[in-house]
């Protein structure tokens, strides 16, 4: 696991990393630290113990007689240097690794973790290191390849459980291509946090396998444990996480739904004070707890025998290093002096000095937080900072100010730098490491990696048109954390690009098929712009609409009239109507249906959901189906017509409601069917509304490219209250580019505030703990907000409540609010006091790729089969629509399922054609309102409909 935090105060940072432990003093803690990274190598400190003054100087941006930072002025007008200190990347090993490394002091397992951390840092240097440089007066991001990292290894959690974790404190500096130190652009690290975490998991899993241990993947996120450790063993030594989960649960919040701020608050609230234990006492307590769960010396000996057997079977490798202190030397594969040539597997060359002296030289600390201890007050080191004791020369240029000096092989030059700043005279320093050529790197791609990349691309392209490359990397590594490496995935993506299977654009990927689908759609719509005759003669359109206005007794809005005129008079097969919510699209469609029918056309409608299709038909009189059902029926009709030798069809107009929900695949299918049926299509919707869950934004694309003739409906008529209408007008106002200006949201909230429509719940700060800066108790604040909101809702009369909604972005809020509302309704006797417990099924919304991968399944999931089949082993027939429960996964890569009659069958997920659900418990009483999530045609129940019990 990886967590990322900013280091806030450089002066207090070392104290935090030194002193936040239980049985080491300051010097002991420093003895077990290490500088790492190519940047550290340039400075000549790579592999050396961290020294207080050097650490402080680098955190404060003093490096090789340069002072990094921005010149600012304080309230007294005095200049000072403002420099962001750095980032703390905390790599935490799985609990089974911590038990082996800390409780039983297995140095091979510990080394696997340390190597994984260093390999991950090297990967960050290779792919996720950026800086900003000035190019012709413009600040631009630039790739770099080196970091200066301080490594601190700790071994306990705040709850005194074994927890192997390493703080990798990344200094805010990198040596750029111009041989100048500049600050990091750390967005790339934060943006790729999940991928970096997966790289660490992958490195660690493969390192453990390389020393002879098996690992068991626990979920689809790539989390794993050493094989043999039971969930009970892991839980016993995970008290810290249990504390946080219970703290959230006591407030009705699931940790999976809790935002980061609430998790942090729970961590602070449950954080215990440090307790005084010596190392021997603590380890003895650990062993006693472990023994009670079956983690005996015999249990551990069996695992260590695997390691010894693996080492004896490994090819002998002469070692040039005495690895008595594995923390300080590490393994040769992590040495930055070695050029990176790519690797396809983790080296299994591990020293096996079973009787070697390897005292535990790691320090203990709690979970990551920002440094808050006392500052260091020693002299600054001259080893790295050069002339840092002098007042730094600075330039107030709104960018990093530099005092430059030349360094060769990490040692400062004594001769002064030439004053001529000509770029032609700049001689790049010799780097003490070989710079990586990413293009020429040779990596052997395993078959498993190819499967993983295929899975990742299939998964993401089902719902996104252009996928950030980092998403593919992360998902592919999680596919098989034991075998798939970061570099192999990159190599496979490069291969697929060269073979024109995928397309890369600005760091994003898509498939050639999807890209071709977009291009075809654009060209097809353009080709059909003069392909049909007008529905109504152009000279008669205005007269006919005037007549309709007289019949209605009111005029159309400008948007309604323009849309109708465009549809009736256009020669294009495809027309777009881009209309905001509340602009009268229903009225426009009613008129369209009436006039088109008079002119011999059949109007048909389609919508994304059953409820939407039902409402479209009820409100406009246009017969409508879901998009999926419409396409099925149209395909069947066209096949029947083709079979019967052709039948004359009446002219048709297809209305696609809420077109922003149409995926690229569906969009192309609709175009194809319309062309074959010689039908016209009106795409109706708002391109800025919610998009399709599937890949692509075709409705927006064809408008932005100008190929779809589109009319606009932006005249708000839904809001009758002028104050609310003013607010809506501000929200939907567009900028010069024709897009809604999100910055107007502030103005909209100001208007609502002036109208006294915003009610803020203020919770007084409680407690005086300086460490928490007297921050509000977020749990108490949220609870009071919930109660106030429910109170306001319940004060409405029943009719008003039936037409009101409480909206929240968090699932945990939804559960709590529903509980509070139900409690109040029972007090009013609007709900029966007797609850009945029901199991409900919640769709996992797995993609097709996810449904076919066994790691995504968990016990007690429910599978609904989309087609019938017979189990070959048992002869049991599973009918289409049957629901079966997942019991377990077997060693053959199949799921063991159980049906309603308790029959067991084995099923391979790769066969697909299923829906996957998770079960949840719900309390339901007479008077409750439920929402249906699956259509049942035989009972005329539609997806999305609501019913009262």
What are these regions (language model features)?
Residues 1-326, 330, 341, 405, ...:
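Intrinsically disordered, flexible peripheral segments
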Residues 30, 116-124, 202-203, 234-237, ...:
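ATP-hydrolysis module of ASCE/P-loop NTPase motor domains
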Residues 553-571:
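N-terminal pre-P-loop "Q-motif" helix
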């Amino acid at each position: 696991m990886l967590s990322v935090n900013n280091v806030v105060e450089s002066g207090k940072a070392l104290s935090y990393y030194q002193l936040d432990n239980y049985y080491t003093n300051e010097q002991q803690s420093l003895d077990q630290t290490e500088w790492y990274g190519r940047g550290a190598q340039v400075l000549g400190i790579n592999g050396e113990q961290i020294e207080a003054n050097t650490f402080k100087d680098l955190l404060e941006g003093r490096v090789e007689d340069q002072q990094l930072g921005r010149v600012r002025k304080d309230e007294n007008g005095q200049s000072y240097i403002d420099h962001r200190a750095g980032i703390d990347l905390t790599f935490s090993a799985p609990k089974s690794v911590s038990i082996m490394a800390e409780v039983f002091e297995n140095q091979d397992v510990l080394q696997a973790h340390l190597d994984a951390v260093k390999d991950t840092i090297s990967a960050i240097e290779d792919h996720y290191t950026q800086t900003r440089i000035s190019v012709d007066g413009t600040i631009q991001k630039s790739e770099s390849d080196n970091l200066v990292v301080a490594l601190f290894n700790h071994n306990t959690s705040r709850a005194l459980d074994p927890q192997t974790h390493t703080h990798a404190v990344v200094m805010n500096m990198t040596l750029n291509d111009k041989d100048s130190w500049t600050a990091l652009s750390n967005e790339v690290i934060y943006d790729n946090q999940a991928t970096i975490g997966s790289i660490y998991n992958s490195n660690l899993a493969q390192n453990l396998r390389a020393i002879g241990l098996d690992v068991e993947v626990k979920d689809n996120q790539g989390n794993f444990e050493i094989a043999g450790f039971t969930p009970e063993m892991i839980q016993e030594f995970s008290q810290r996480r249990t504390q946080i989960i219970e703290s959230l649960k006591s407030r009705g919040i699931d940790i999976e739904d809790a935002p980061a701020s609430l998790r942090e608050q729970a961590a602070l609230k449950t954080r215990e004070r440090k307790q005084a234990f010596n190392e021997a006492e603590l380890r003895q307590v650990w062993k006693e707890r472990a023994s009670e769960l079956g983690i005996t010396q015999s249990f551990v000996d069996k695992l260590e025998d695997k390691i010894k057997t693996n080492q004896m079977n490994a090819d002998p490798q002469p070692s040039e290093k005495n690895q008595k202190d594995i923390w300080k030397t590490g393994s040769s594969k992590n040495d930055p002096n070695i050029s990176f040539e790519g690797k396809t597997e983790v080296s299994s060359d591990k020293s096996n000095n079973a009787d070697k002296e390897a005292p535990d030289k790691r320090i203990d600390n709690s979970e990551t937080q920002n440094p808050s201890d006392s500052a260091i007050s020693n002299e600054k080191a001259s080893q790295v900072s050069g002339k840092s004791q002098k007042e730094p020369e600075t330039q107030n240029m709104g960018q990093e100010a530099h005092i430059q000096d030349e360094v060769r092989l990490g040692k400062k030059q004594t001769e002064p730098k030439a004053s001529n700043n000509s770029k032609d005279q700049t001689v790049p320093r010799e780097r003490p490491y070989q710079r990586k050529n990413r293009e020429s790197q040779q990596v052997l791609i395993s078959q498993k990696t190819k499967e993983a990349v295929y899975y990742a691309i299939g998964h993401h392209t089902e719902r996104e048109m252009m996928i950030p490359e980092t998403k593919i990397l992360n998902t592919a590594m999680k596919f098989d954390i034991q075998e798939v490496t970061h570099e192999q995935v990159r190599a496979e993506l490069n291969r697929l690009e060269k073979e024109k299977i995928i397309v890369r654009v600005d760091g994003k990927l898509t498939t050639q098929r999807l890209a071709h689908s977009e291009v075809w759609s654009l060209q097809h719509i353009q080709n059909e712009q003069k392909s049909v005759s007008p529905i109504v003669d152009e000279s008669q359109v205005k007269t006919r609409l005037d007549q309709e206005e007289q019949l209605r007794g009111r005029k159309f809005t400008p948007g309604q009239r323009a849309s109708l005129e465009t549809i009736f008079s256009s020669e294009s097969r495809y027309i777009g109507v881009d209309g905001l919510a509340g602009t009268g699209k229903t009225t426009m469609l009613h008129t369209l249906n009436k006039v088109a029918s008079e002119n011999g056309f059949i109007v048909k409608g389609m919508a994304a959901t059953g409820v939407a299709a039902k409402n479209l038909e009820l409100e406009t009189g246009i017969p409508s189906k879901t998009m999926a059902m419409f396409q099925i029926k149209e395909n069947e009709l066209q096949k029947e017509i083709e079979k019967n030798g052709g039948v004359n069809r009446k002219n048709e107009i297809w209305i696609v409601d809420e077109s922003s929900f149409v995926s690229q695949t569906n969009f192309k299918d609709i175009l194809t069917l319309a062309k074959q049926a010689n039908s016209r299509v009106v795409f109706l919707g708002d391109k800025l509304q919610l998009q399709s869950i599937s890949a692509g934004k075709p409705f927006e694309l064809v408008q932005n490219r100008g190929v779809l003739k589109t009319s606009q409906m932006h005249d708000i008529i839904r809001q009758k209250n002028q104050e609310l209408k003013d607010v809506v007008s501000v929200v939907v106002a567009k900028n010069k580019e024709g897009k809604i200006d999100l910055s107007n949201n502030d103005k909209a909230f100001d208007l609502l505030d002036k109208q006294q429509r915003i009610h803020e719940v203020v919770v007084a700060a409680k407690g005086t703990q300086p460490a928490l800066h007297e921050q509000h108790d977020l749990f108490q604040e949220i609870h009071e907000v919930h109660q106030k909101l429910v109170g306001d809702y319940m004060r409405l009369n029943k009719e008003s409540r039936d037409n009101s909604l409480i909206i929240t972005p968090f699932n945990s809020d939804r559960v709590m609010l529903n509980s509070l509302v139900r409690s109040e309704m029972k007090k009013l006797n609007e709900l029966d006091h007797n609850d009945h417990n029901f199991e409900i099924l919640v769709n996992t919304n797995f993609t097709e790729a996810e449904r076919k991968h066994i790691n995504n399944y968990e016990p007690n999931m429910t599978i609904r089969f989309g087609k019938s089949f017979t189990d070959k082993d048992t002869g049991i027939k599973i009918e289409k629509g049957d629901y079966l429960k997942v019991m377990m996964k077997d060693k053959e890569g199949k799921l063991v399922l159980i049906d309603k009659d308790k029959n067991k069958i084995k099923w391979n997920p790769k066969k697909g054609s299923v829906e996957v659900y998770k079960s949840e418990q719900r309390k339901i009483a007479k008077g409750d309102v439920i929402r249906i999530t699956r259509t049942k045609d035989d009972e005329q129940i539609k997806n999305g409909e609501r019913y009262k019990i």
